[in-house]
């Protein structure tokens, strides 16, 4: 597939949802990365209220639930993701403090200064890194933390093919240093930043898609939209293999220290 200025957001909503529902993770990441980011967050008690925004089916949320003792409210726009999320919660018997709710990240169901921690892995791009940081800040208590993972450039210059792909897919992609500056501008003190290893993209995201793609295509034989979605995901994986030294995911952890 060539870069024809298509982005995954342009595919059929229900098809995208069904495709990614079959995956443990809906973006690059790992339990180890979630745990590492959480290690920079201090003073979470049983009374803490955590929000996981753009939670998907909850791979990272279950890690948070295992390693914290507070209440977790997880938000996602896709009802089928939340259905799967809440089934995981039931299996783990966490219903007393973890719940998934269908909702939009630009209309969150929280009060000002209600949250001790805002979490968002591979999802803040849906609203935009800068906008999300600014708009979500009011929900955090003073002393609260925000932890988000975000696609970022590793270099100042890139080959045209990968530059064009990301400018179409997510124009707000930027360098690590610029992302940290944006976090500061939004009113946070940067606490930590670290890069994801390649395995978070390959073994834990693209490889699991291979089997899912075959199952998906067998279900939708002759469906051009389904074929196009799979072709796009395969193209994205090929680009990562070719240009991984130029970009990847990074975690950004910040703290709100004043109103």
Segments the model singles out, each with a brief description of its role:
Residues 51-53, 57-107:
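Class I SAM-dependent methyltransferase SAM/SAH-binding core
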Residues 117-130:
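A short SAM/SAH-binding and catalytic strip from SAM-dependent methyltransferases
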Residues 131-145:
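A short glycine-rich, Lys/Arg-flanked "PGG" loop and its adjoining helix->strand segment in the class I
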Residues 172-187:
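Short alpha-helix
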